Amino acid sequence: MRYFLLVVMILSVCMKSFSQTKITGRVADKDGHAMEGFVTLNIPGESNILSFADIDDEGMYALDYNGSADSICIRVSGFQIGNYSKVVANRSQTLNFMVEVKGINLKEVDVKADPVTIKGDTTDYLVSSYQQQGDRVIGDVLKRVPGVEVSKSGEITYNGKAISKFYVEEMDMLQGRYGLAVNNITADAVSKVQVMEHHQPVKMLQGMGRTDEVAINLKLKEKAKGTYVLATALGAGISERQGKGVRGLWNEELVGMYFGKERQTMQTYKGNNSGDDILAELSNQYGSAGLAPVSRVHASGPGTPGVPQKRYMDNQTHALSHNWLERLDKDKEMVFNAVYSHDFQNREGYTYTEWYRPEADAVRLHESQFSTNRSHSLDLSHRYTDNSSRHYTSNALSAHVSWNDDRVDGQIWSQNYNSIVIQRMRSTPLRFYDKFIIQRRMGDNVLRFNVFGGYAQSSQKLRVVEHEDSCRMQELMPRTISLGAFTSYIKQFRHVRGEYGFNGRSAIYGEEGMLMGHADLNAEDCRNRMWYGIYRVSVFQDYTYMYKRGDIKLGLPVALDAQSSNDMVRHNRHVFFRPIIQPSLSVSYDWKVYNTLQGKLHFEQQVGDFNSLFHGYVMEDYRTVLRSQVKDMFTRKNINVSGNYQHSNALRQFFFNANAGYSHTWRNQIDALVYDGIYSTSIIHELHNGSSSVFTGIGMSKNFSWKKCYVKLNVGYSHNEYQRLIDGNMMSCSGNLGRINVAGSITPLRWIGLVASFGGMVSRTSCGRSVSDMVKDYMGRISLKLCPIEQLTLNVSAEGTYDNWNAKNHYRYFSDAGIQYSFRKVSLELEGNNLLNQKKYVMNRNDNMDMYHLEYALRPRNVLLKVRFNVL
């Protein structure tokens, strides 16, 4: 520990020793009146802006510069004053400007706003600079904003970092379901996209050290404020059937929204059977409440291919949401969110699997399956927040209930097995959770108090019928109860902030279940009825040293765990006590103006795991049963080291990030697989084992004003080493994975747009002396947009995929087309999908030396016509 603290002190002294130039001054006219504008700093003879500041209401400005240049150029600019500059020595000083007001004849001036402006940690992107013909919603524009990425799941990242908050007019109505805003607020309604780095949503903590969070705020145009908008879309079409004939398609939308100063609302209904994934926008990208019942049981059905869901999803889906925010005063607000969905899906596919065995031939299995999945889901949440400069109070209550019914009919065959297998799985998850937070600021210090509690359960039943005289059934009811309280005190010592706290929590897990129909197993071994409790008391102290260009953080939490287990079937009771220490260290440094370096070191411990304590058999799916044979508590220790470099130059619209990391894990338990024909038993044994991983990645994006061009690149590589226990043989295994994604866009002429993308993945694994074949998957897509007139937009796209595993058909091709025509306030959209009528998609995967070959039925060729218009 002495050496650890010595390193921290040396780093602190080194960071503080970097010299810094501070330029301050006032900008005024000859009469002393403050003028509006901004001030920049650059090296004489160079165009790169190294520092930037706005002139405040008093005419004052302040610039910071870290560099070794002998001289620097300070430039003042403004709409009414023109440009003024001075070259001065590189030293801290006061530099005032006396400027002259210049009259401007607006009729003779073409005023064009800059696409990017920066004020402190906030970067404004002018939507009109990135919007193109045919862009309907703000999500279409976000994909072109420099540094912004929108993943397939809907998650938004900025220069490789996931956003932590999404606001509309500085209000978070959607509470993480920001896909509703991205996919429904029209692009014409948004003026600017604001990216806020080092974002601190709690006002009383602002100025007490910077965070590593990123947030996005949509600034609306005046015409979009204070007006209720109700928009609808009605769609109908036809699709070929897998056999013969055609079937009808429908696609409906109704969206209402209101954005005012004191109130925001959004109501949505969407439904279709045309393959559109309308549930993705309802996902909470902030994460769930952190409380969920244990789920061990599922029906094994066709997997999902690596193509957009619209290509394969045979669905009937309905989704409704109601979102409401009321601002009670400038600090207080209430938010209510309700989401309901009903989803019915058919899936059809064929899977060939080879399970690796070190001392025997691989287990080979063919599965031809058809599944139907039905679900109903309801989510309710309410949040009250009082967020002022002196105190913060928040209470968040959430509830979730769903009903799921899955049926899988399949023909299963292997070397010595051939049978019809019917699986029926039903589950009803239920969850309630509440979290209360109160914080008070006392001078430069802060007192915090949090309390939370929740309950979750899930009734699960899996029924498997094989042949005509064989029926197995697994019933399971897991429950979770969680309670906790947390309090801390933050003390500010000039450049050092210390946080000292106490944390107490308890989590109680219960499970009751029975496996029926296994005549070869003892009846008592097929029952589970147990309770498991974790009771933790911890104290912690966190220190943050803050300097002008970054900070150093040191965390020293210490905890004592008391854990108890009670197996009421086997009459076994155990109590364990374990100390836990989890120190962490992180360093952040802003290098020059646009560069940030970060390093993190973290040691973690986990003691106890409910999933390792059940001693009765549980049928996971029709092929696999699970069981634990351990007596001691599960223990896991993990050390993580990572580094990150970010370059963010919004003015030049260039972003780059690189990261690398290493992780090593020690465990005292391992899952052992034992095969018996196509069936397997997974047994948890007490056996020390370890795993390690190395990863590295690079991301880059660059926008050009020339031809509205942009280029994006993401490259990554990971290497993993781990151990497996199969049929009593302990093996050392490793896996390598490389990936690349490239995308670009260009508009060579006003009426032509071209977008191209390419993605690829290469993987290989090994266990013992066995090495798998290389698995390669590539996908490329090119889209052409034509805009012959302002009201008409034509889109044509072609897509190709390749894999090296299927010798008969390496390549697959797809083509789609669309026409959009707008007149007055009505928009007509005609789309055709899978015009080449591909019947199936082939995908291959290598996982722990197990090989998976998937053939999945795709949606046949289809055409859909949609009419959009505003009701209000």
Task: State what each model feature region is.
Residues 19-22, 26, 30, 58-60, ...:
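Membrane-proximal, glycine/serine-rich, low-complexity loop/turn segments characteristic
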Residues 42-48, 73-86:
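A short, solvent-exposed loop/turn motif at the edges and junctions
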Residues 524-530, 538, 628, 634, ...:
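Outer membrane beta-barrel strand-and-loop segments of large Gram-negative receptors
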Residues 46-60:
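Short, acidic Ser/Thr/Gly-rich low-complexity loop/linker segments typical of extracellular
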Residues 206-207, 243, 269, 278-284, ...:
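Outer-membrane beta-barrel translocator domains and adjoining extracellular loop/strand segments
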Residues 29-45:
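Short, ordered, surface-exposed loop/turn motifs in non-cytosolic proteins
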Residues 448-456, 478-512, 518-665, 783-785, ...:
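Structural signature of Gram-negative outer-membrane beta-barrels, strongest in the C-terminal barrel
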